[in-house]
Design a protein with these regions (language model features):
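C-terminal motif of bacterial Sec signal peptides marking the signal peptidase cleavage site
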Residues: 19-22
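Edge-of-domain interaction segments
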Residues: 24-28, 152-160, 185-186, 193-284
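Gly/Ser-enriched beta-turn/beta-hairpin loop segments
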Residues: 28-36, 63, 175-189, 241-242, ...
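N-terminal beta-strand block that forms a small beta-sandwich/beta-barrel module immediately after a flexible targeting
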Residues: 30, 34-77, 92, 274
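Beta-strand/loop subdomains of soluble extracytoplasmic proteins
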Residues: 40-41, 45, 107-111, 134, ...
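Small beta-strand-rich domains/subdomains or short beta-sheet motifs embedded
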Residues: 53-63, 68-75, 100-107, 137-139, ...
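Short hydrophobic beta/alpha edge segments that flank linear recognition/processing sites
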Residues: 62, 67, 84-105, 115-141, ...
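Short histidine-centered loop motifs in beta-beta connectors
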Residues: 73-93, 111-125, 194, 259-265
Length: 284
């Protein structure tokens, strides 16, 4: 009988030990989870200097190219070097403005040309060229607004389950339908990426196109994910040395899809919350 009582007492003690150990482990796990959450909430990034390549990408459809515009780079006198309906080759001079040569980026046909000795303003369409081939059209209004006039643009494309990645032969401004009231005008905010005639594609194929401009060096950059806002201006949460959280307005420049250029509002070394103000449940 005494032996039975001892066995029961021993079992009770062992059960109590296991129960306390389990509670301790659960408590430790909960504490670690709280610590991880606190650490995650306190994540920050610093404003750094670096390089960034302005980039825009989208998925679109291959279509026959439409005529594109060649514009005057400045105010001045335009003199033509070609005739209407003339067949031209890539790199051929089509005219000059104040002595500056205007060249066609591709082979094509001149379908419209301004008269010689004509005074033209900057950005005035002086010629329309028809390229016989395929193209990809990209809505790039926001992208273009961050770039200087006549920025050098390059593009590559990848056909879905097909050819690529392949260089585009030119990035141009497509012409809108001309009429007696509007004259020659570009399609606003649209870039037309021309595909070489030697590349085997067909109309209607889906493709991803990536357009890039000249890389900018030694600029202030932050990850896109920390900013509320994407175009022109945005908001970030600056963490001061004493831990104060300050909602700060910033002026934004070009982006490569992952990072964005900071034009004003922050300085190199500033510490910013990794959570943008509009997504931070704690507020400011």
């Amino acid at each position: 009988m005494k032996l039975l009582r001892k066995q029961m007492l021993l079992c009770s003690i062992l059960f109590l030990v296991f129960t306390l150990s389990a509670c301790s482990a659960i408590g430790q796990t909960d504490e670690n989870n709280l610590t991880d959450s606190a650490t995650s909430a306190k994540k920050t990034v610093s404003v750094v200097r670096g390089t960034i390549t302005p980039t825009v990408s989208t998925q679109t459809t291959i279509v026959p190219a439409v005529p594109f515009i060649i514009s005057s780079p400045e105010n001045g006198i335009f003199n033509t070097a070609v005739e209407l309906e003339e067949k031209i080759t890539a790199g051929q001079i089509i005219g000059t403005v104040n002595g500056k040569e205007l060249k066609s980026p591709v082979d094509g046909t001149i379908t419209s040309i301004a008269p010689s000795n004509e005074s033209v303003p900057s950005n005035y369409p002086v010629a329309i060229v028809h390229y016989t081939g395929f193209a990809l059209n990209v809505e790039a209004d926001n992208f273009l607004s961050t770039l200087p006039e006549y920025a050098e643009l390059k593009a590559k494309f990848q056909v879905y389950d097909g050819v690529g990645p392949t260089d585009m032969i030119a990035v141009v401004s497509p012409a809108a339908d001309e009429n007696a009231f509007t004259g020659i005008v570009p399609q606003e905010g649209i870039l037309q990426c021309l595909i070489s005639q030697t590349v085997d594609v067909k109309s209607g194929q889906s493709a991803t196109v990536v357009i890039t401009a000249t890389t900018r060096n030694d600029v202030l950059i932050l990850p896109l994910s920390v900013i509320a806002g994407r175009q022109g201006t945005g908001l970030v949460t600056v963490i001061t040395p004493n831990g104060e959280r300050v909602e700060t307005k910033v002026t934004l420049g070009v982006t490569d899809g992952a990072n964005i250029e900071i034009l004003s509002g922050l300085e190199e070394g500033d510490v910013v919350s990794a959570t943008p103000p509009n997504l931070d449940p704690r507020g400011i």
